[in-house]
Amino acid sequence: SSAASDVYKRQRLYNKILPEVVSKFSPGTFYWPSSPFSRHGAPSKENIGDRHFWDVWGGEKSIDTYLTARSRFFSEYGFQSFPDIETIKRYAPNKSDWNIYSEVMMSHQRAGINANKKIETYLIDEFGKPHDFQSFLYMNQLLQGDAIKMAIEAHRRDMPFCMGTLFWQHNDCWPVASWSSRDYYGRWKAQHYFVRDAFRDILVSPCLKAGNLDIYVVSDRLNKAHSQLKISFMKFSGEVVASFEKDVVIESNSSKKYFSVDLEELLKDLDTRNIFVFLELITDEGDTYSNVHFFNRQKDLDYPTVTIHKEIKIIEGGYELSLISEKFARGVYVSLPGNNCVLSNNFMDLLPKKLVRLNVYTCLLYTSPSPRDTER
């Protein structure tokens, strides 16, 4: 039959012709015919071959499902968000369309008629209900970033069982709500900043297990890294509840647990809704890696109202922006009119009384008619 002939041609192309071509012109190069693929049994299983994992998003399972999913190589998984408001203004210039269920917003959705509802359901479950359209966009981007960051960290901690993780997707071919980490116009979503850090050569990563907080360090370096590990349990106000320091030697090309603490004993009589953990690893060469962990869903955390102090200094190509807050500030977002700029960092967690600097590259001129401080 025609169908059987097509299958034969495809199998011959991928399983005979292409591997022979690769072997001829690039001897020694490993050949993998497709994705997902397994040389033994069905593809997309957790213990053989590579896996496309869509239980989260596609299967509508909770985001923390990423923590327990396993694969030798995650070759596809993702979570959707809307693009930046300035991108949306290009295809929805009328504020009357600024509703995720408007015709124009539904039309600019990569995953069909149910996808916007799916985004909203996940968002309300994790963050609560936004008070307006732009808050929805901002919180949705944080949610996407948190979800994919969680997945990448879990995959890297599972090294060497899992030796690869590729999120879907990097960019868009039209302005749309999608799984991308950069939108059609190249504007970075929160996810792009988060995965950049999650893929650094060294990752310090927390993991809750059996009532303990385990601290893993994952290294892709080919040499050992003599380092100092710092763990701080803090209230959002800045009060330190407990802290630990430990000199560690990070093994090359490895994932290993370097610290563990019993949370029931440590946090008894404390309200975990206003507590977070700050992790910091400093190598002898001065390289710094950090992470933040919360004990509740974002909507259940008791975030304080904060005042963010800012200073701006002119640098080549733009400005250096310094930010500091007396209290913890989650996901601080910086934008300029039209958002025609490149930022070295964004969607940042500001630790109490800790200065953060970022570069803002833009051709816009700076004037200062507004107060230096921002309340949020």
Which residues are covered by each model-predicted region?
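Beta-strand-rich binding/interaction modules
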Residues: 213-249, 258, 276-278, 329-337
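Intrinsically disordered, low-complexity Pro/Gly/Ser/Thr-rich segments with frequent PxxP/GP/PP motifs
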Residues: 239-270, 340-364
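C-terminal accessory/binding modules appended to enzymatic or scaffolding proteins
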Residues: 307-348
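Aromatic/hydrophobic beta-strand junction motif of beta-rich domains
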Residues: 215-220, 321-325, 360
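Terminal connector regions
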Residues: 264-302, 364-368
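Active-site neighborhood of glycoside hydrolase catalytic domains
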Residues: 2-38
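Substrate-binding clefts and catalytic carboxylate motifs of secreted carbohydrate-active enzymes
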Residues: 22-23, 33-35, 55-223
